Regions:
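Nudix hydrolase/Nudix homology domain
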Residues: 1-43, 54, 98-102, 164-201
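Acidic, metal-coordinating catalytic segment for phosphate/diphosphate chemistry
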Residues: 30, 35-80
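Short, contiguous, pocket-lining structural segments
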Residues: 37-41, 73, 84, 94-96, ...
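N-terminal strand-loop-strand
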Residues: 58-103, 130-131, 154
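Nucleotide phosphate-binding site architecture
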Residues: 90, 110, 180
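The catalytic Nudix box helix
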Residues: 103-138, 152, 160
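Active-site-adjacent beta-strand/loop module that shapes the phosphate/pyrophosphate-binding cleft
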Residues: 140-162
Length: 201
């Protein structure tokens, strides 16, 4: 029996491109698969000595004989935040985004930081403003390649937009009735934006 798929009638697509057509359960399943595959590809050799590692099925981890430590999947925590000011929200545009798309701000949590501290720092570094009244929204696995996105709402406090991060090309305040192209609902950034609109419409 032929167990291989005939792929002549199929195309490989970037997972980001089909976010809008996936329900949360499907995205979580695909995301888990992608993250585990990335971890397995990048854990074949020990980072301490360079020797080939062994996969220990009972532990679901790789292990090297040089120190017997287990190598588990690594997840990088990131904050992502929607900054609001009444009927306006602050959205930024990364150079990696599709043309015309704007999104919420995000960044990695550094060692020793809480989520809230990382949020305040990232916002200040990226757009130069201060925020207050930080409120947790939700989280989402983000397999590009292995992030956990931790979403928050944050209220504008003070300052003017000053772009100090090379990743951000543009950032503006947008009225809720005049938004640019935004991420799909399947992404946590899209969910943050739509949730705020629903609560303030």
């Amino acid at each position: 029996e032929n167990l291989f798929l005939d792929l002549d009638d199929y195309d490989f697509v970037d997972l980001r491109m089909i976010l809008g057509s996936l329900d949360q359960e499907s995205f979580s399943l695909i995301g888990r698969s992608k993250m585990i595959n990335y971890w397995r590809r990048n854990s074949k050799y020990c980072g301490a000595c360079g020797k080939k590692t062994d996969f220990i099925s009972s532990e679901e981890a790789f292990q090297c004989s040089c120190n017997n430590e287990f190598i588990y999947p690594k997840i990088s925590p990131c904050i992502i935040t929607l900054i609001h000011r009444g009927d306006e929200i602050l959205l930024g545009r990364s150079k990696h985004f599709p043309k015309g798309m704007f999104s919420t701000l995000a960044g990695f949590i550094e060692p020793g930081e809480s989520c809230e501290e990382a949020l305040v720092r990232e916002v200040k570094e990226e757009v130069g403003i201060n925020v207050k009244n930080i409120k947790y929204f939700s989280s989402q696995n983000w397999p590009f390649p292995s992030q956990l996105m931790i979403g928050y709402f944050a209220e504008y406090d003070s300052g003017e937009i000053i772009l100090e991060d090379e990743e951000i090309e543009e950032a503006y305040w947008f009225n809720l009735n005049k938004l640019p192209s935004i991420p799909p609902e399947g992404s946590i950034s899209g969910l943050l934006i739509r949730s705020y609109i629903e609560d303030h419409s």
